[in-house]
């Protein structure tokens, strides 16, 4: 296991055909032949390919989403249930972290009395024995670029992932499975619970993120959006 820097990440993706998967239900509007043809497949947080769901019902989405995962991108909080064994089994060779291993700023809200929402160091203390492959952790300065692009709101993991990949200048970046939680679900079929965000002055603003993501296709000719994002 090695911790790698931003230049390593840029070299890793540059010139490659890359597919990045969010976990909105529309990620299933794909087929495995198309997805498996990409050089690198990036999946976010609690992605689903094949297994047993939270309701103890087995699922198999391989015919829709492919069966390979080359890169896992996550904020790696306690809600991320993927184990190192899960990721290794799926073929992950690079982990990319959304958050810096640093304290950002004071952030006191009712549901977050310990201010953990803007101090990411506890995430990494809990994960100190987790890392098993090349791992990228952004600097505070890089993270704040995305925070500032949303006028002082916390970026979602998907938004940060897409912007990180855009900076790497791949040959193609196919973006699928992102809907800004419009359908009310994530992890393909689980309800999105965002009650705390309504009371958080720096909480997510997915509508603004979706507007930005859709606009990327007009600035970068290597961006390819899925059917839902293109509408």
Residue positions per predicted region:
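Metal-ion/cofactor- or nucleotide/acyl-coenzyme-handling active-site neighborhoods
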Residues: 1-231
């Amino acid at each position: 296991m090695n911790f790698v820097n931003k230049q390593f990440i840029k070299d890793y993706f540059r010139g490659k055909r890359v597919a990045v998967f969010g976990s909105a239900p529309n990620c299933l509007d794909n087929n495995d032949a198309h997805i498996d043809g990409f050089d690198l497949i990036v999946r976010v947080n609690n992605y689903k390919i094949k297994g047993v769901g939270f309701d103890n019902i087995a699922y198999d989405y391989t015919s829709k989403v492919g069966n390979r995962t080359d890169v896992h991108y996550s904020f790696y909080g306690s809600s991320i249930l993927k184990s190192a064994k899960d990721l290794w089994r799926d073929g992950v060779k690079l982990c990319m972290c959304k958050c810096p291993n640093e304290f950002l700023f004071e952030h006191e809200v009712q549901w977050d009395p310990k201010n953990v929402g803007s101090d990411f160091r506890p995430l990494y203390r809990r994960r100190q024995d987790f890392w098993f492959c090349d791992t990228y952790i952004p600097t505070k300065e890089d993270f704040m670029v995305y925070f500032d692009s949303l006028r002082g709101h916390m970026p979602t993991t998907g938004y940060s992932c897409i912007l990180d990949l855009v900076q790497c200048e791949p040959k193609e970046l196919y973006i699928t499975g992102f809907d800004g939680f419009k359908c009310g679900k994530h992890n393909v079929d689980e309800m999105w619970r965002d009650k705390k965000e309504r009371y958080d002055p720096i909480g997510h603003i997915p509508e603004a993120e979706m507007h930005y993501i859709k606009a990327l296709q007009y600035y970068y000719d290597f961006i390819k959006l899925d059917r839902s994002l293109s509408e």
